[in-house]
Structures are given as structure tokens and as C-alpha cells.
Amino acid sequence: MRRISKHSLVLLLLLIGCGKLKELPTAPGGGGGGEPIDPTATLTRVQNEVFTPTCGALGCHDPLGRQENMILTTGRSYANTVGVASNQMPSLKRVTPLDPANSYLYRKITGAGITGDRMPQGGPYLTDGQIKLVRDWIRRGAPND
């Protein structure tokens, strides 16, 4: 009887431990999955702090430049990124919600696993804070706020 109780206790502790693991925030495919997700990482912030000043300007990803047929101006960036296949790597979406490591846009701004140049082309590249903002927005599910 005592032996069954020890086994039951061990099983109970394992089940409790597994339940706590489910509560940790994670992101499939890497891309900062172990770090807390910034709840303020919204499309509005990404637009104002990343897309508008660095991507949708200077004739690159604006309605005139349309590099890679991607427009990153206010009101158009979401439809041109989330769930849209990359022109350079069609097997990847530009933004795959919850999965920065498999989002081509995230790869392009970090320079990891890409075709062509890191973005913004020729630099200056995004700051660590800007990259984290994009990563956290994707990890939050890339909501259209």
C-alpha cells in the first residue's frame, strides 16, 4: 500500500509540473519564444515606429515604389503582410501569426535565412528595440488593431 502511495505522489507532482509548463508564454519556431511578450506590441506601434519611418518611405514600400509588390503604408500594411506569401520565398508567408521565425518579414529585418539583402536595404538597419517590437507583434498573433 505504501508503494502505491509513493507512485501516486510522484505522478501527482509530475501532473502538477506539466500543468505549470502550459502557462509559460511560448512561440512556435523560435523568434524569442522564451521571453515575455510585450502586450503593447500592436500594429499601430509597428506602423508608427517601424513601417512608416523606415519601410514605407523613400520610395521603397509605398504605393509608388511597391518593392516586391508590398506596400507598408498606414491602412495597407496589414493586408500586404499577414498571411501573404513572400515573393522571394513563396513557401513562407510575409507574416505568419504567432511564428516570427517562419515570417519572412521578420527574417528580412534580422538577416537570417533570406534571399537578397537584409532590410532596410543598405541600412541603417532596425534597432534591437524595433526588431523586438515586430517580433512581439507577430508573437501576439499579428492582430490588426
Can you annotate each of these PLM segments?
Residues 23-35, 39, 44-128, 132:
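Solvent-exposed helix-loop boundary motif
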Residues 1-41, 135-145:
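Post-cleavage N-terminal segment of exported redox proteins
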